[in-house]
Amino acid sequence: NPAAKKKYSELKVEIKKTGLKNADKIIGQADMAWYQKQGDNVNYAKTAVAYMDKYPSEDPNVLNNMSWTFYEKVTDPKMLAKAVEWSKKSNELHKDHPAFLDTYASLLFKSGNKKEAIAQQEKAISIVKKSPDAYGGESLLKELESRLAEFKK
């Protein structure tokens, strides 16, 4: 929609004019949301990588969510490599979280590292089996096992 794009560009100019210290950060977040909403995965990925390079996150949830979005939407190997880094970091910051391990395993698999993907997914499954109530029980376990079966094909 050209009119919406024009309006969005005008809003970004207005944000910059405010002189806010974090205007560029706000615009970066808005750009990611804009491209995602438009279904423009190529520009979303480029914007997200530039944003994360400029404003690195130490929040494992942010890192995992960005990584999972890349798993679902991005095909460029260089961009996926960035998501693998973010996902690895999320797992370093929050050890033994099955959902974070699943994201990491999924990205490894999509990037062609099948052996390590299987190892990470098996680790996630093991954690859920030890404490099923802490991680959503059977539904998560089935999801993880289903993805592991895909990895092993």
Located regions from the model:
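Oxidative protein folding and maturation machinery
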Residues: N1-K153
